[in-house]
Amino acid sequence: LNDRWPNCINNLDTKESLSTQIAPCLTRETSPIWMDSSTSTECREIAEAVGGDSIVCSKSGSIAIERFTGPQIRRFYKTSPEAYSQTARIHLVSSFLCSVLCGVDAPIDTGDGAGMNLVNIHEWNWDADLLEATAPELIKRLPQIAKGCTTAGQISDYFVQKYGFASGTPITVFTGDNPSSLVGMGASKPGKLVISLGTSDTFFAAMPGVVADPQGCGHVFGNPAGGSMSLQCFVNGSLAREEVKDKFGYDWGQFTAALINTPAGNNGKIMVPFFRPEISPRVDLKAPILNGSDAFKSWQDADAAIRACVEGQFINMKLRTDWMQLEPEVIYLTGGASKNDAIAQVAADVFQAKVQRLAVSGSVALGASLRAASHSLGLDLDEMQGQFCKPEAGSTIEPKAPSDAYNSASKVFEGLLRKR
């Protein structure tokens, strides 16, 4: 955005569209999206400038990531130096929309802001070393960083006059989809984990303190409800489960029966269930690793292979998230596979915590609504989450396996990865 930006949003004309009025403020016609991965060179440059990936991770909560804002800004500066020089303000989508709604230049919150490789997670402010490594004079182009409980401003007259909003309505600073979802799922305090079982599996939770992943696979963000939160993605999610199911020509009913008919621990038969390169941990496998009987290793034991796949996924998930120092009281499962009680039972057994399915839909929007009601109206967030973020009735699954059931399997799993 150029230097016309502040005056533009403060003087929006209801007779004109937002796009017509804001377009002249843009210093680039297109913006990269979250799937862009063209900035590998810039990631290396940023890491080298500050002393390596581990330093970037310890400072920002993540290693330098291609789709994160910092590397994208560096590429913009390198490829379009003139446009960069004309840029007076750089916003995330969340803070940009918040600014438009308020009619003032809004801050970036610690939740969405931590996904930039620019924010120091120990101070929750811009990190001078990372800014310098990214682009010149970047600090003057960035808005302030603010916690999620910050009032960004009041509703702009544009929206009052054009759409009938109540004048003086306070606007709570916007955040990203994952931090907002954490609140909307009722998991904004430590002790509650959320595991989303989808094409990729995602694990996120409120953290009791601020600590970065020493392996550089996970991410740390600001928790909009206060403190910090973690997020970690696992590429080999539902697609891996489907690969094993299809390998034996099973349907989902037979898949479930296989889990029910095999014991926790799978009699020592273990699978590293990576059918494609994984990011947690970062390994370039194209096929699973199997350890056990000859029949099992040659894919002749269908039921054991199915249990090994699901157990391997949750064992890997627990191993990769131990750095978060969590003591889960409950795991909230969401996503398509969460409906499967047999899969949920494996999660309960591996993590030694009760599992519940969430009945929440639209958790991102719900989280935003709960935050606004808590911050602006003074309503108790815990009470509202208890009312609006209830688990499905009768969905609680308690662990059945003994607490040490997966100790040996976890060690073997790690050994298989080291030997690959």
Describe these PLM feature segments:
Residues 29, 112-118:
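Glycine-rich phosphate-binding loop of ATP-grasp-fold ATP-dependent ligases
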Residues 1, 338-339:
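Gly/Ser/Thr-rich loops at beta-strand to alpha-helix junctions
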Residues 107-111:
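A short, surface-exposed helix-loop junction/capping segment
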Residues 135-147:
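A conserved helix-loop-beta module that forms one wall/lid of the active-site cleft
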Residues 144, 332-333:
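A generic structural signal for short
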Residues 34-35, 147, 232, 335:
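Small/polar loops that bind or transfer phosphate-bearing groups
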Residues 40, 44-63, 67-106, 117-137, ...:
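Active-site core segments that coordinate phosphate-bearing ligands/cofactors
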Residues 1-66:
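Active-site phosphate-binding/coordination module
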